[in-house]
Design a protein with these regions (language model features):
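C-terminal soluble interaction/assembly domains
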Residues: 225-293
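Acidic/His-rich structured neighborhood in mature extracellular/periplasmic domains
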Residues: 65-201, 250, 255-259
Length: 400
C-alpha cells in the first residue's frame, strides 16, 4: 500500500512540475511577435472542417509574401515563428502544425509551438543548428517516426519509383549557408548526418509523367496532402514542397509558397504543367497528416525527468532526444519541487536497487505502464523490447 501511494505521489508531483513549467520553458526557446502569436490563437479557435484542416489552414496564407531563409536570422538556434513571410518549407511546417494542433484539441500558442518543434527538430526541441531537420528526407522520416505524418504510396503502378536519398549538398556547399560558412565542426556534423541517412529508402513516388492523371486514376492523393517534388539535382532529395489541390478541371494543382509569384498561391496551371517547366523535377512523393498526430506521437511515451546540471545524465539526454518514445523534462529550474522529488526518490524501493549498484544520478523514468525506474539500465531491465542497441546502459555518461 505504501509503495502504491508513493508511486501515485511521485506521479502527482512530477505532473504538477511539468504541466505549467513545460509551457513556460517552451516560449523561452521561441522567437515570435505578439501579432503572430495572437493570429495562431485566432486560427486555432476557428471551426476548421474535420478532416480538411490542412487545406483550410493552407488557404489562410494565400497572398503571404514569399521570403526565403527566415530561419537563418538568429545565430542561436531557436524556434522562429513567422506567419508574415513564408517559403515552401515554413509554409508546410506552419500549416501542418496548425492542423495537427487543431486535431489534438490544442487552443494555446504554446500548444502550437510544441507541435511545430516536433516537425522542425530532431528530438522535438531546438538544440543547435544541427538539430534542425534540414533535408526533406530527414524531416519526413522524423515526422513519420513520431506519428505526425504517414507516407502515401497507393498502387505501385502509379507510385512506381522508390526514393533513395543521396544528400550532400549542404556539406559540399557550406559557403551558401550563413550559419555553416566558416564553421568546420558544424559542417562535419552535417556531413556525418548526411552519410548516416544516405541509402535508406524513403518510400515510393509518382513519376512526373503520371502527375497529370485525373482523380479517378490517382484516388490515393487527397486535397491537403503534402507533396514533395523529387529532384535529380546532385546532392538533394526534394527541391520544393506544397499541398495537393484537386482543381475543377479534375487535375492536381499545387498550393505553395512560390518564388516565381513571390507569394503563396494556388497554381492556376496543373501540377503536370508546373513540373514540366522544371526539368530537374522527376516526380512527387506524398505524405498525409495522421488522424490523431499528437496522440499518436505521445502514445506509450516514457517521461524522463533530469537535471540540466546533472553530470551523469549525458546518456539519458542523448537517448531521450533521439528516440521519440521518450519525453525529456528538465527539473533544473524548480528547486522546491526537486527537493520533494528527491525525498520520494530516495525512499522508493526501485531506487534502492540502483543505489546499491552505485548509480545515483537524477534521472527518473515514468512509463505509461506505471513502472518507475531510476537509471537507463533499470529501465531497460523492465522494458527489454524498448532497448535500441541491445547493450547495457548506465549513468556514467558513456551512453548506451
Amino acid at each position: 500500500m505504501f509503495r502504491k501511494t508513493l508511486i501515485f505521489s511521485l506521479f502527482a508531483i512530477l505532473a504538477s512540475i511539468s504541466a505549467s513549467a513545460q509551457h513556460r520553458d517552451i516560449l523561452k526557446e521561441c522567437i515570435y511577435t505578439p501579432a503572430d502569436s495572437a493570429r495562431v490563437v485566432r486560427l486555432l479557435a476557428e471551426k476548421a472542417p474535420q478532416g480538411g484542416e490542412v487545406l483550410y489552414y493552407a488557404r489562410k496564407f494565400l497572398g503571404v509574401p514569399y521570403v526565403a531563409a527566415t530561419l537563418e536570422r538568429s545565430k542561436q538556434e531557436r524556434l522562429i515563428i513567422n506567419l508574415k513571410e513564408l517559403d515552401c518549407s515554413t509554409l508546410a511546417e506552419t500549416v501542418l502544425a496548425l492542423a495537427a494542433t487543431k486535431r489534438a484539441g490544442g487552443r494555446r500558442f504554446e500548444d502550437y509551438c510544441h507541435t511545430l518543434m516536433q516537425f522542425r527538430y530532431r528530438g522535438g526541441r531546438p538544440d543547435g543548428y544541427v538539430s534542425r531537420l534540414h533535408y526533406f528526407t530527414w524531416w519526413a522520416n522524423s515526422a513519420v517516426k513520431n506519428g505526425l505524418l504517414q507516407h502515401v504510396d497507393g498502387q505501385r503502378k502509379r507510385f512506381s519509383k522508390q526514393l533513395v536519398p543521396n544528400v550532400y549538398y549542404m556539406s559540399a556547399n557550406a559557403d551558401k549557408y550563413p550559419l555553416l560558412k566558416g564553421r568546420p565542426a558544424r559542417i562535419d556534423s552535417i556531413a556525418r548526418l548526411e552519410k548516416a541517412e544516405n541509402g535508406k529508402p524513403l518510400g515510393y513516388y509518382i513519376l512526373q509523367e503520371n502527375t497529370g492523371l485525373g482523380r479517378n486514376a490517382l484516388p490515393e492523393v487527397r486535397d491537403g496532402d503534402l507533396i514533395g517534388i523529387v529532384t535529380n539535382k546532385k546532392g538533394l532529395d526534394c527541391s520544393h514542397l506544397g499541398f495537393a489541390v484537386w482543381g475543377k478541371d479534375g487535375k492536381l494543382h499545387l498550393l505553395n509558397a512560390s518564388s516565381i509569384h513571390k507569394k503563396v498561391v494556388e497554381e492556376p496551371k496543373t501540377l503536370r504543367q508546373y513540373l514540366s517547366e522544371h526539368p530537374s523535377s522527376i516526380g512527387i512523393i506524398v505524405y498525409r497528416l495522421t488522424d490523431n498526430p499528437l496522440k499518436t506521437n505521445r502514445k506509450n511515451m516514457t517521461k524522463v525527468y533530469v537535471m540540466s546540471t546533472c553530470p551523469d545524465c549525458a546518456a539519458v539526454k542523448e537517448l531521450a532526444k533521439e528516440d521519440s518514445r521518450f519525453e525529456l523534462i528538465d527539473l533544473g529550474e524548480h528547486v522546491r519541487n526537486l527537493k520533494a522529488f528527491l525525498r520520494l526518490r530516495d525512499t522508493h524501493p526501485a531506487f534502492e536497487k540502483v543505489k546499491a549498484r552505485g548509480s545515483i544520478g537524477i534521472p527518473c523514468f515514468l512509463s505509461e505502464d506505471g513502472s518507475v525506474s531510476f537509471s537507463l539500465e533499470d529501465y531497460f531491465e523492465k522494458h527489454p523490447d524498448a532497448e535500441p542497441s541491445g547493450e547495457a546502459c548506465s549513468l556514467d555518461g558513456k551512453g548506451c
